[in-house]
């Protein structure tokens, strides 16, 4: 038995952070253990540096920035593994699919070692932000042209995500409707996931969550080759 890893994805400005925090609060009110991780995380040295680059306070090459993002994602893998062991619902705002979509917009291939594949992904679909910022306030990657390229990359990536692990939601829907859809589906995924001990990694290896020892913690020792491990299965993956 383990927790689940949920990601909320989409271009900047479509309400991901709002929905992630609402989901966490709603789950906690229903007595689920839930945690929300947002990338980039300003509480880490790597995350703080990334935010400086995104806010145009520090210059860095595109290749260096995407490598830094990859490192930043990997920094949280041990924490995510421990939370899954403790049966938490881990909600991630911007994760592997964002890393791929944004890197591809700059023609860069990123390293995906030690990154988990989400149990379920909610993609808030929109080609442009719900409230566009003035040009002077736009972060790196927030120009109209760049966001359209990133959206196109997202749609290609989402086509490769198994449909039983994906919900594509128009970001322009009423926020309450989006929240209800995400909450209902997350609970179902958690309930259906209760018998699983493994989580798949991006390189198609598996982390044996059941064998993790939180007192002598070396999560990478529990990574195993693909060997017909059981996986979450749900025929209700849907697109609206």
UniProtKB/Swiss-Prot annotation:
GO terms for biological process: dTDP biosynthetic process; dTTP biosynthetic process; dUDP biosynthetic process. Keywords: ATP-binding, Kinase, Nucleotide biosynthesis, Nucleotide-binding, Transferase. Gene3D superfamilies: P-loop containing nucleotide triphosphate hydrolases (3.40.50.300). ATP binds at residues 10-17. The lineage of its organism: Viruses, Varidnaviria, Bamfordvirae, Nucleocytoviricota, Pokkesviricetes. Belongs to the thymidylate kinase family. Pathway: Pyrimidine metabolism; dTTP biosynthesis. Catalyzes the conversion of dTMP to dTDP. One of its GO terms (molecular function) is ATP binding. SUPFAM superfamilies: P-loop containing nucleoside triphosphate hydrolases (SSF52540). Signal peptide: none annotated. It is an enzyme of class 2 (transferase). It comes from the Viruses. This is Thymidylate kinase. Its EC number is 2.7.4.9. InterPro entries: P-loop_NTPase, Thymidylate_kin-like_dom. It catalyses: dTMP + ATP = dTDP + ADP.
């Amino acid at each position: 038995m383990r927790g689940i890893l949920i990601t909320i994805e989409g271009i900047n400005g479509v309400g991901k952070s709002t929905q992630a925090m609402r989901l966490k609060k709603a789950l906690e009110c229903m007595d689920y253990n839930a945690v929300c991780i947002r990338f980039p995380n300003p509480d880490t040295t790597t995350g703080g540096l990334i935010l400086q680059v995104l806010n145009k306070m520090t210059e860095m090459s595109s290749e260096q920035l995407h490598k830094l993002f990859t490192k930043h994602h990997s920094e949280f893998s041990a924490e995510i593994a421990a939370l899954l062991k403790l049966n938490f619902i881990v909600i991630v705002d911007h994760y592997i699919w964002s890393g791929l979509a944004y890197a591809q917009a700059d023609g860069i291939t990123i390293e995906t070692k030690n990154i988990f594949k989400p149990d379920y992904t909610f993609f808030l679909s929109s080609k442009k932000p719900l409230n566009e910022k003035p040009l002077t306030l736009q972060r790196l990657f927030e120009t109209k042209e760049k966001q359209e390229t990133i959206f196109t990359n997202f749609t290609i990536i989402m086509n490769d995500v198994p449909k039983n692990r994906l919900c594509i939601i128009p970001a322009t829907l009423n926020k309450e409707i989006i929240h209800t859809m995400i909450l209902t589906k997350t609970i179902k995924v958690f309930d259906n996931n209760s018998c699983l001990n493994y989580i798949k990694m991006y390189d198609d290896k598996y982390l044996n969550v059941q064998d993790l020892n939180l007192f002598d913690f070396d999560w990478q020792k529990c990574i195993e080759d693909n060997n017909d491990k059981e996986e979450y299965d749900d025929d209700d993956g849907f697109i609206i």
